């Protein structure tokens, strides 16, 4: 069961009221030649601090990384004078198993009499090192239009069009990056947002002069006059996980080989310490009688939109795409995705998100005759905030004595068994010192929240995105045989998706969350569990929640449709654990 409330005040007052209410709460802290490890050995990040014993399952046997045998060599590429072969990751290493300390691809020189026809016609100036084709009117204009300064070489005179210094849009470098949706990470640059095509009209934001890149259609600042805060109550961890956790870090439901039509929230990097801490501490209460109060505030700073066509690619990405073999070799295209991601951002919302989860002991609340409604009401009643926030007094029918009782419960939580079990914070946007102060200390003060909001203006995070597959950037304007390269990238993306999914990991114990990092799998353990498989714990008879297996391959097209399936057996639910959420099958038109 879920209950939601949403309200708006002029400043982050509503959220801070609850912060004030809880302000005294402390936050706890095969070939004989084998194909190189992509990651270091496993380091368990569990925060458990008490004495533990090994569970009945005990430590699982180490799983060694395993690659397939080598593919056949490709034909000799007539332009690169090289041939290629690769190996697939059959099984990631796990539980301190042997890593793959060897390469999963090989390239060697070769000779061929076939002609190279890789040149793309350029009617302008061909840049010396980057190979970019630019209009001759951009020569000697004071801008590095080529990316290698060759357009500014041997100039008798520089005809500079921009006579005033102008700033770059906030986060514009990140917006030019490719994106890996499996890990929620930004990779290498695929677009050149330092290319202006001679444009020099200033764009004023907050009395600052910005120069609009050629690739950008719009960059629209958002007014910070009002903030909306949403507060939602979840009666169980399964409800909380489905509605909050999966949206925070999981994109497993996307079929990444196709366009994703709508804008969606950009999750937190799955390898970040902040997310691992969040998962570990909330997962601890997956089978306790707890209620979850989740509060979330999103601050939007700017909306970004990319031009729909005729984009200037970053020269590093362009050169890599121009070098991939025309004969399909998964290893080369896989490396392209590893370095540059597999999608790029076409629209984005920039800003910051502050969210916290208050975990309450349901039985203790019932014994004391309190509800989460009481906590919310007290948070909005009779609290005076700092000078940066105007005083707000709201009477919601809760007695003063009851509010004081709630506050005393919170204040004394470390001295006796109280209602409040934990408070876990996630912050995105703002300078790093503000993120650290918010996420790893007590609840923020009004002044600190105001500082964070100011910092978000100049250091925004990407909080929502709309994306397209990377192969959509490959056009005949830049790449010879672009249709072949595009089809190869499309095919490689489907294979890449199957190779990097955490469903390939063996189950962790104690409801640990498996994550795949390169060629190994790690377990993020709930607080109270540790070990490479989360097998060391003092807790007994813990119900095990179900997790999905990997998707099957798509069926052949029949009646205009194709289907794929998965099973809830990795592991299956045990001892009263929750079943898998989401569909067991998917169907697409074909």
From Swiss-Prot:
Disulfide bonds listed in the record: 65-100, 76-110, 79-116, 122-133, 127-146, 140-155, 162-200, 378-403, 503-550, 505-521, 508-523, 525-534, 557-590
Domain TSP type-1: 64-117, 545-588
Residues noted as binding Ca(2+) in the record, renumbered to the chain: 138, 141, 143, 145, 151-152
Domain LDL-receptor class A: from-to ranges: 120-157
Major localisation: secreted
Pfam family, one: EGF_C8A_B_C6
Region described as Disordered: 557-590
Residue numbers covered by the propeptide annotation in the UniProt entry: 33-54
Top-level lineage group: Eukaryota
GO CC terms: extracellular region; membrane attack complex
Keyword Ligase: no
Keyword annotations from UniProtKB, A to Z: Calcium, Complement alternate pathway, Complement pathway, Cytolysis, Disulfide bond, EGF-like domain, Glycoprotein, Immunity, Innate immunity, Membrane, Membrane attack complex, Metal-binding, Phosphoprotein, Repeat, Secreted, Signal, Target cell membrane, Target membrane, Transmembrane, Transmembrane beta strand
Glycosylation sites: 44, 70, 73, 101, 551, 554
Domain MACPF: from-to ranges: 158-504
Membrane topology recorded in Swiss-Prot or TrEMBL: Multi-pass membrane protein
Domain EGF-like: from-to ranges: 505-535
Sites bearing Phosphothreonine, chain numbering: 418
Localization, UniProt: Secreted; Target cell membrane
Spans through the membrane: 252-259, 262-269, 379-386, 392-399
Chain's role: Component of the membrane attack complex (MAC), a multiprotein complex activated by the complement cascade, which inserts into a target cell membrane and forms a pore, leading to target cell membrane rupture and cell lysis. The MAC is initiated by proteolytic cleavage of C5 into complement C5b in response to the classical, alternative, lectin and GZMK complement pathways. The complement pathways consist in a cascade of proteins that leads to phagocytosis and breakdown of pathogens and signaling that strengthens the adaptive immune system.
Quaternary structure (record): Heterotrimer of 3 chains: alpha (C8A), beta (C8B) and gamma (C8G); the alpha and gamma chains are disulfide bonded. Component of the membrane attack complex (MAC), composed of complement C5b, C6, C7, C8A, C8B, C8G and multiple copies of the pore-forming subunit C9.
Protein name (Swiss-Prot/TrEMBL): Complement component C8 beta chain
Annotated organism of origin: Oryctolagus cuniculus
């Amino acid at each position: 069961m879920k209950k939601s409330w949403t309200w708006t005040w002029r400043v982050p007052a509503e959220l801070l009221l609850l912060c004030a209410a809880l302000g005294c709460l402390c936050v706890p802290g095969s070939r004989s030649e084998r194909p190189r490890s992509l990651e270091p050995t496993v380091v368990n990040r569990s925060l458990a601090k008490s004495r533990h014993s090994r569970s009945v399952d005990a430590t699982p046997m180490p799983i060694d990384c395993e690659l397939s045998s080598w593919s056949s060599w490709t034909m000799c590429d007539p332009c690169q004078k090289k041939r290629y072969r690769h190996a697939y990751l059959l099984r990631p290493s796990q539980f301190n198993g042997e890593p793959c300390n060897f390469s999963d691809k090989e390239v060697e020189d070769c000779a061929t009499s076939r002609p190279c026809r890789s040149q793309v016609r350029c009617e302008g100036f061909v840049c010396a090192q980057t190979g970019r084709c630019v209009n001759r009117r951009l020569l000697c204009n004071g801008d590095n239009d080529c990316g290698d300064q060759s357009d500014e070489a041997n100039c008798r005179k520089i005809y500079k069009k921009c006579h005033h210094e102008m700033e770059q849009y906030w986060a514009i470098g990140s917006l030019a990056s490719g994106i890996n949706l499996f890990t929620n990470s930004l990779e290498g640059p695929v677009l050149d947002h330092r290319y202006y095509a001679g444009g020099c009209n200033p764009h004023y934001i907050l009395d600052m002069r910005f120069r609009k890149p050629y690739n950008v259609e719009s960059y629209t600042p958002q007014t910070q006059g009002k903030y909306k805060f949403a507060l939602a109550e979840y009666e169980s961890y399964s409800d909380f996980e489905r509605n909050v956790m999966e949206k925070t870090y999981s994109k497993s439901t996307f079929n990444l080989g196709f366009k994703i039509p709508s804008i969606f929230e950009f999750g937190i990097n799955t390898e970040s310490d902040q997310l691992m801490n969040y998962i570990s501490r909330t997962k601890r209460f997956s089978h306790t009688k707890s209620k979850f109060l989740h509060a979330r505030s999103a601050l939007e700073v700017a909306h970004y939109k990319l031009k729909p066509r005729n984009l200037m690619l970053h020269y590093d990405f362009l050169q890599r795409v121009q070098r991939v073999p025309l004969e399909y070799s998964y290893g080369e295209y896989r490396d392209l995705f590893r370095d540059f991601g597999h999608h790029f951002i076409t629209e984005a919302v920039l800003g910051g998100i502050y969210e916290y989860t208050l975990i309450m002991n349901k039985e203790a609340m019932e014994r004391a005759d309190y509800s989460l409604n009481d906590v919310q009401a007290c948070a909005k009643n009779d609290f005076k905030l700092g000078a940066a926030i105007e005083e707000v007094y709201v009477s919601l029918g809760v007695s003063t004595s009851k509010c004081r009782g709630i506050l005393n419960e919170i204040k004394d939580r470390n001295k006796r068994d109280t209602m409040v079990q934990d408070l876990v914070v996630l912050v995105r946007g703002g300078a790093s010192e503000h993120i650290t102060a918010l996420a790893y200390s007590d609840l923020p003060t009004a002044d600190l929240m105001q500082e964070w909001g100011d910092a978000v203006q100049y250091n925004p995070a990407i909080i929502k995105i709309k994306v397209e597959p990377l192969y959509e950037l490959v056009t005949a304007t830049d790449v010879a045989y672009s249709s072949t390269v595009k089809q190869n990238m499309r095919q490689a993306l489907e294979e890449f998706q199957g190779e990097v999914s955490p469903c390939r990991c063996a189950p962790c114990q104690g409801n640990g969350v498996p994550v795949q990092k390169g060629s190994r799998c790690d377990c993020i353990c709930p607080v109270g569990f540790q070990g490479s498989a989360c097998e060391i714990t003092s807790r007994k008879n813990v119900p095990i929640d179900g997790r999905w297996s990997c998707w099957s391959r798509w069926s052949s097209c029949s009646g205009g449709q194709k289907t794929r399936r998965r099973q809830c057996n990795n592991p299956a639910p045990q001892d009263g654990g929750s079943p898998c959420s989401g569909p067991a099958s998917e169907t697409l038109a074909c």
